[in-house]
């Protein structure tokens, strides 16, 4: 497969999922949190909401370098698909916030009522495991 075909496989998977595990770190402290997300294929980024005062929110303000995973709960090993990623987060403001928030609220209507900050996680590296393409098949992408 070429790079375009690889990215299309990753894109399809990310567009069908909706929860990521976000891993943050500052100094010798690490923390993970599950967040609902929308995949922005144009910027190869995730949009997600989280408060500034959460443990991971505070850590992202100190160190915007993050990593994480996306995985379904598959019972059969031959069907395993999942993503490992790393990237950098920024808190959105102004017009970018409005655009991301509108799309996020369309996907998750319950979020319309909250004023939680919205963040963009710019993906720098993705590694996907897709056992439906062959046991242990890896598809990699880098910015």
UniProtKB/Swiss-Prot annotation:
Gene3D superfamilies linked: Electron Transport, Fmn-binding Protein, Chain A
Domain of life: Bacteria
Family under the similarity heading: Belongs to the UPF0306 family.
Name of this chain's protein: UPF0306 protein plu4501
NCBIfam families tied to this protein: PRK03467.1 (NF002900)
């Amino acid at each position: 497969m070429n790079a375009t075909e690889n990215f299309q496989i990753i894109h399809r998977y990310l567009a069908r999922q909706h929860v990521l595990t976000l891993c943050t770190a500052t100094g010798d402290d690490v923390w993970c949190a599950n967040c609902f997300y929308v995949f922005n294929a144009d910027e190869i980024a995730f949009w997600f909401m989280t408060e500034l005062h959460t443990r991971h929110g505070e850590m992202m303000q100190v160190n915007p370098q993050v990593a994480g995973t996306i995985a379904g709960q598959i019972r059969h090993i031959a069907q395993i698909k999942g993503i490992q990623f790393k990237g950098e987060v920024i808190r959105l403001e102004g017009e970018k916030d409005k655009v991301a928030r509108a799309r996020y609220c369309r996907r998750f209507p319950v979020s319309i009522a909250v004023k939680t900050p919205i963040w963009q996680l710019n993906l720098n590296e993705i590694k996907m495991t897709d056992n439906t393409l062959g046991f242990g098949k890896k598809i990699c992408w880098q910015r």
